[in-house]
Amino acid sequence: MSITKEFDTITAISTPLGEGAIGIVRLSGTDALAIAQSVFKGKSLEQVASHTINYGHIIDPKTGTIIDEVMVSVMLAPKTFTRENVVEINTHGGIAVTNEILQLLIRQGARMAEPGEFTKRAFLNGRVDLTQAEAVMDIIRAKTDKAMTIAVKQLDGSLSQLINDTRQEILNTLAQVEVNIDYPEYDDVEEMTTALLREKTQEFQSLLENLLRTAKRGKILREGLSTAIIGRPNVGKSSLLNNLLREDKAIVTDIAGTTRDVIEEYVNIKGVPLKLVDTAGIRETDDLVEQIGVERSKKALQEADLVLLVLNASEKLTDQDRALLNLSQDSNRIILLNKTDLEQKIELEQLPDDYIPISVLTNQNINLIEDRINQLFFDNAGLVEQDATYLSNARHISLIEKAVQSLEAVNDGLALGMPVDLLQVDLTRTWEILGEITGDAAPDELITQLFSQFCLGK
């Protein structure tokens, strides 16, 4: 996908393929109205007012056959998402009808849009910057209301504003350094001393480091916590999974070894998306299929952000239990003593003090798991502060870290007594790195790669 501006007219189906109440086929470009009009029987789309919805029929211009009864939205440039003429054909939902209309539009001169091309045009035409474009996809992929809140704030420009303001301050500082170098005789320009440059770079660094502190929370809310449910066979792992999901997605029986693979599900725990991984019971076994499941379970444990270790409170600790306690001790772990509704035989004195007694059968203390997750990952603070700007995108986090390193290089140079003018390089690099976040200084290959991750029709 080229990153140069293109003025051909593109089209794509913007709703998921399948049966539904409506389907939407979108057009964007200079000829959007003319192409839509060529297959539309109703009002003249080229004469109706912008941002209106118009009733009519889609017809095959060759045969005159009616394809569907539709409502057509007309939006004229520049007051559209792409800042081009946009037409959206609202059809009855269905694979056949939307595909037929799409093919008609292509035959009439539109080009099939590439993934993310509508949003790419919005970026190229200055409607959104790169962080806002990425926020569009984050909204689509948000699994909880908290993740959606962060994405909407980013789409609204909160992160862009912070980055742009910081870049402007850095640019002002660079300009002041340049004036001092080129025109040292000017008395009305504040001298950029070593002390003043140190003060400014420390101010920039502090701001970016504060932003980085939001990254852990933001990334969790955006991507979720990979959560491994581990334990020896038949201690209630799958029952716990089903309890958290509130539906029967895993096989639950009284036969040890019935979970022979890794089952993954997402669940919303107080606004935090947990990617729950129900692992096969980790034990020695001669069953080849079960052995594969056990190996996958060990891998899931190593990669997990959170480990829920389930023990059977109605039985004494086994060697397998002790092995799992040792295996998971360096993880963010919550120990769950299940089956507390039965007579307890487990040796509590051999366990860490932070276990939670639960009964999946009676739902006892399941809510405490949510509280412990909040304690482990958010220090019991609220998940999202309404006025805060959060980093949640791995690309943004990496670039902010690089920008901080560049500022540290400036401060290190100042500490070594380097002349102010020699430190311009690192300060300029900081300015360029921040520009990659918003797209002002992003390489063409990066922009192409980012938009290729979008879905068709967006």
UniProtKB/Swiss-Prot annotation:
Residues noted as binding K(+) in the record, renumbered to the chain: N234, T253, I255, T258
Name used for this protein in its record: tRNA modification GTPase MnmE
InterPro entries xrefs: G_TrmE, GTP-bd, GTP-bd_TrmE_N, GTPase_MnmE, MnmE_dom2, MnmE_helical, P-loop_NTPase, Small_GTP-bd
Underlying gene: mnmE
Binding site for Mg(2+): S238, T259
One MF term in the entry's GO annotations: GTPase activity
Family of the protein in this entry: Belongs to the TRAFAC class TrmE-Era-EngA-EngB-Septin-like GTPase superfamily. TrmE GTPase family.
Location of this chain's protein in the cell: Cytoplasm
Keyword Acetylation attributed: no
Disulfide-bond pairs as recorded: none
Gene Ontology BP annotations: tRNA methylation; tRNA wobble uridine modification
Cofactor: K(+)
GO terms for cellular component: cytosol
Organism: Streptococcus pyogenes serotype M5 (strain Manfredo)
Keyword Nucleotide-binding assigned: yes
Gene3D superfamilies: P-loop containing nucleotide triphosphate hydrolases, Probable tRNA modification gtpase trme, domain 1, tRNA modification GTPase MnmE domain 2
